[in-house]
A protein has these predicted regions:
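Nucleotide/phosphate-binding catalytic cleft detector across ATP-hydrolyzing
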Residues: 7, 21, 78, 95
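Eukaryotic intrinsically disordered, low-complexity regulatory regions enriched in Ser/Thr and Pro
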Residues: 14-19, 23
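Hydrophobic, well-ordered secondary-structure segments
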Residues: 24, 34-38, 501-508
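Charged, low-complexity surface segments at secondary-structure and domain boundaries
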Residues: 24-30, 42-46, 448-457
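Short amphipathic beta-strand and strand-loop transition segments with alternating hydrophobic
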Residues: 29, 35-81
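Positively charged, helix-rich recognition surfaces that bind polyanionic ligands
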Residues: 76, 84-511
Length: 511
């Protein structure tokens, strides 16, 4: 048949596994064997080519990660496509008489306004995670959070990384491009299925990053194109959500599916809502203290001369040593500094030299991928001791700092103090992604993902998903407060600027 190009493992050929099981923490995951080493091993065992392997490929054999068997008959991949068949296809159009997509949005608003037990699923692309979700209730409590680097035991982050190492070569190899495309779509399909289950389990709406509102770029593991594909697939999944394990006429069965979205003409025309999906601006989500709402808005780029540095230090209310906490305290009012045009709900803050921070190592005037750990209080003490400044009495140190001319060193310590996200490069430690706050919260604690329990975000990417969920919660609360039967809902109530977000977060309006 010409229907499908046969890919056959001939009888007598040796088949080799493409992945192996590895224990990580308390989980077993499937780790892919890089394509180049798999090909070497396959050719070697089937006596194809030179009969030699690289040391890297040999290591997989020596460590027992390779399982092989000899085919006792011809094995044809996707055999069902190799034969001619007739298929009787009878399409059914659900909601054939529906006149408008608008009803989906309006009925969603009514559902949210009337439903007591509702949750919000925040979805975020991460710097260290392909996708991260956080499920919160109407009081902002985390009910569930997880990364989607590993799905069904497979480390897809590593798998995609391995596949795309040969991206340049892949551009010339359409078969390899097709494999990467299929891998991404297969991954997204599994993630979307999981999210769809959560929507039904928690009576949840979905909050996700608005692609048309300052879409974040930079060091993210899911690029814009793939994220748009994810968004499209999620809309299509929730447009008519059915579960195969339910009876045909049961709620959620094939004839009584959940219609939770509508299919838009294009993503750009969706606006801020597509049924159960709400789009929120993602600004100030991952690098914000989830317990106090503190965020670093300082700009250090223009502190290029002593005059500007003296002015910066002089604007602090106090710089002093706190003997009880055994840390240094910087107190300030954000109104005295440039705030990137942002209006805060709380402007007066006290930050402390709490814990350690990562500082990237500079070689020949350029930043490297390596970092060093700086113990803030210890570094501050040594700096003041070298300058001959006494600090144990707890008095304000600003005058002596300027007098001794160490403003640059103090500002460097302060910059690290308000640097909340601290991530090592992948070459150092791919798992190290710590968020640590310099501000005491209501419990008298400094938020730190290294010590936070499961009721709080577990890393910086988790914090991004959590805060996106909280932005979704803001909209849920606005709907509950302003929706009225048989009246047009005022859509302007769902607009969120930075001022609104900081007020909601810093004043804990969600409690």
């Amino acid at each position: 048949s010409d229907v499908y190009k046969r890919q056959v493992h001939k009888k007598g050929s040796v088949l080799v596994n493409r992945s192996y099981t590895q224990t990580v923490g308390d989980k077993e995951i499937r780790v892919s064997i890089p394509e180049e080493y798999y090909t070497e091993i396959y050719n070697y065992l089937n006596h194809i080519g030179k009969g030699k392997m690289s040391s890297e490929a040999q290591r997989y054999l020596d460590e027992g990660k390779i399982k092989s068997f000899t085919a006792t008959k011809d094995i044809v991949k996707n055999y069902r496509y190799c034969c001619d068949h007739y298929f009787l296809h009878l399409p059914i159009t659900i909601n054939f008489k529906a006149k408008s997509d608008v009803a989906v949005n309006e009925r969603t608003l009514a559902y949210i306004a009337k439903k007591e037990d509702i949750h919000i699923i925040g979805i975020d692309r991460g710097e260290r995670n392909l996708l991260y979700i956080s499920v919160v209730d109407v009081h902002g409590n985390i009910r569930e959070q997880r990364s989607f680097n590993i799905v069904n035991g497979y480390d897809y982050q590593q798998k995609l990384k391995d596949r795309e190492k040969s991206r340049d070569a892949a551009r010339k190899n359409w078969e390899e491009i097709e494999k990467i495309k299929e891998l991404k779509e297969g991954y997204l399909s599994m993630v979307i299925h999981y999210i769809a289950q959560l929507v039904v389990k928690y009576n949840a709406v979905v909050a996700m990053e608005d692609l048309n509102y300052g879409f974040k770029t930079g060091r993210f593991k899911v690029e814009r194109q793939v994220y748009q594909k994810f968004e499209t697939m999620l809309i299509e999944k929730l447009h008519y959500l059915v579960f195969k394990d339910r009876e045909v006429c049961e709620e959620g069965g094939v004839l009584r599916g959940y219609q939770l979205t509508y299919i838009p003409e294009s993503l750009k025309k969706v606006g801020k809502q597509c049924g159960f999906i709400f789009y929120v601006p993602a600004g100030y989500t991952s690098k914000i203290d989830p317990t106090t709402g503190f965020v670093n808005l300082f700009s250090f780029k223009n502190l290029t001369n002593r005059e500007s540095r003296q002015d910066f230090v002089g604007k602090f209310d106090e710089i002093r040593y706190d003997r009880d906490k055994k840390m240094f305290e910087f107190s300030f009012d954000y109104n005295n500094y440039i705030k990137k045009g942002t209006i805060l709900a709380s402007t007066k803050w006290k930050v402390y030299t709490n814990g350690t921070r990562l500082k990237r190592i500079v070689v020949n005037g350029k930043y490297t991928s390596q970092s060093m750990e700086v113990e803030l209080t210890d570094a501050m003490e040594k700096m003041l001791q070298r300058a001959g400044i006494e600090y144990h009495d707890g008095k304000d140190l600003k005058g002596q700092i300027v007098e001794k001319g160490i403003e640059a060193e103090i500002i460097d310590i302060f910059r690290l103090t308000v640097q909340m996200r601290n991530s090592r490069s992948e070459s150092e430690d791919r798992e190290y992604d710590r968020l640590i706050s310099p501000v005491l919260n209501d419990k008298g604690e400094f938020f730190d993902t290294a010590t936070a329990d499961k009721t709080l975000p577990q890393d910086a990417d988790a914090n991004g998903a959590y805060c996106i969920a909280l932005k979704g919660l803001y909209e849920v609360k606005q709907i509950k407060e302003n929706w009225k039967e048989n009246e047009q809902f005022p859509r302007n109530k769902l607009v969120q600027d930075n001022k609104t977000w900081f007020d909601f977060m810093q004043k804990k309006r969600y409690l």
